[in-house]
A protein has these predicted regions:
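Gly/Gly-Pro- and Ser/Thr-rich, intrinsically disordered tail segments characteristic of DNA damage-repair
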Residues: 1-214, 220, 337, 341-345
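DNA-contacting surface of Y-family translesion DNA polymerases
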Residues: 7, 180, 188-332, 338-346
Length: 346
């Protein structure tokens, strides 16, 4: 039986919740985050995005792009509560739900509680319920696998609804920029470009052997995605083992002050991801990749969960002291939290 998969992605979720709850913020460029010198944008409204403001951008750069930008502090408890309300709507149609974060999820509606034959009708109903009951906007992608459903949900944002039928998949993928493929970030995209691969059609022309040689196990996925193949199931119980982020630097750095500043930005983004996913762990890992692509990792485990910048940044600095980089310029800095933490309850 051909699967019916929906990907739901809330549009500018944090910012939209703030605009919903505060009429004075509606219609203006809005950023959720901190405006101070070293602050980072956690989310940007569509009014702000018109000026080029994006999440994970430094607040200073965001204000240069949009001087009239308004900042508000995030309310993670509210976002989590709204996310639970969204999932209650999902559960009216299926219990096979794989959350990716507070604001997006996959749904397998092949067999659904309402016995609705068309997945696109379920997607329409979910979007309408979210709009009417929660006064928020969602985009939805519908297809026969996770890869295409996620691509479809991004296609007509905001408030989008896109369906990719099996008969349309090859043509759709052919024109897809390589950066839009799942698992291809800026560094991998740059490598793809160096190999003459810029879109789905060019990726499809590559053999599995060549892609595996260049990209390891990920090459198999790229080979299959370019052919519209994705056999991964929607995992109703998705156990996350870690949360992390990495920054590949525009220029290699070796000056201590520059490294510390970049470490701060990575740590700040890590905190935002921890809050968004709700993940809790007590092991911090620092990853440093040097200009020659050699890399080192250092880890430290605490007796309690690591959730704040005040805890994580000093630990990261301590791990950094164990790595010699003044004579080996750094090209990438990464931080991750792992070892899921469960508090024992008496």
């Amino acid at each position: 039986m051909e699967r019916k998969i929906i990907h739901i992605d809330m549009d500018a979720f944090y910012a939209s919740v703030e605009q919903r709850d505060n009429p004075e913020l509606r219609g203006i460029p809005l950023a959720v985050g901190h405006a101070e010198e070293r602050g980072v944008v956690a989310a940007a409204s569509y009014e702000a995005r018109k000026f080029g403001v994006r999440s994970a951008m430094s607040s200073q750069r965001a204000k240069r792009l949009c001087p009239q930008l308004t900042f508000v502090s995030g309310r993670m408890d509210v976002y989590k509560a709204v996310s639970r309300q969204i999932h209650e709507i999902f559960h009216e149609y299926t219990d096979i739900i794989e959350p990716l974060s507070l604001d997006e999820a996959f749904l397998d509606v092949t067999e659904n509680k309402q016995n609705i034959p068309l997945a696109v009708d379920i997607a329409k109903a979910i979007k309408q319920k979210i709009r009417e009951e929660l006064h928020l906007i969602a985009s939805a992608g519908v297809s026969y696998n996770k890869f295409l459903a996620k691509i479809a949900s991004d296609y007509r944002k905001p408030d989008g609804l896109c369906t990719i039928h099996p008969s349309q998949a090859e043509e759709f993928i052919k024109h897809l920029p390589i950066e839009s493929f799942w698992g291809i970030g800026p560094v991998t995209a740059q490598r793809m470009h160096s190999l003459g691969i810029h879109n789905g059609e060019q990726l499809r022309a590559c053999s599995q052997e060549m892609l595996t040689r260049q990209f390891g196990k990920a090459g198999v996925l790229y080979y299959e995605f370019s052919r519209g193949i994705d056999l991964r199931p929607v995992e109703a119980v998705r156990i996350r083992k870690s949360v992390g982020c990495e920054h590949t630097l525009e220029k290699d750095i070796s000056r201590q002050s520059s490294v510390i500043i970049e470490l701060y930005h990575v740590a700040t983004e890590l905190i935002e991801r921890l809050q968004r996913t709700g993940f809790k762990g007590n092991t911090l890992t620092l990853k440093i990749k040097f200009h020659d692509f050699n890399q080192k990792t250092r880890s430290i485990t605490q007796s309690h969960e690591l959730t704040t910048l005040a805890e994580i940044l000093p630990l990261a600095k301590g791990l950094l002291k164990d790595i010699e980089y003044t004579t080996h310029p750094i090209r990438l800095i990464g931080l991750s939290i792992s070892n899921p933490y469960e508090k024992n309850e008496e």
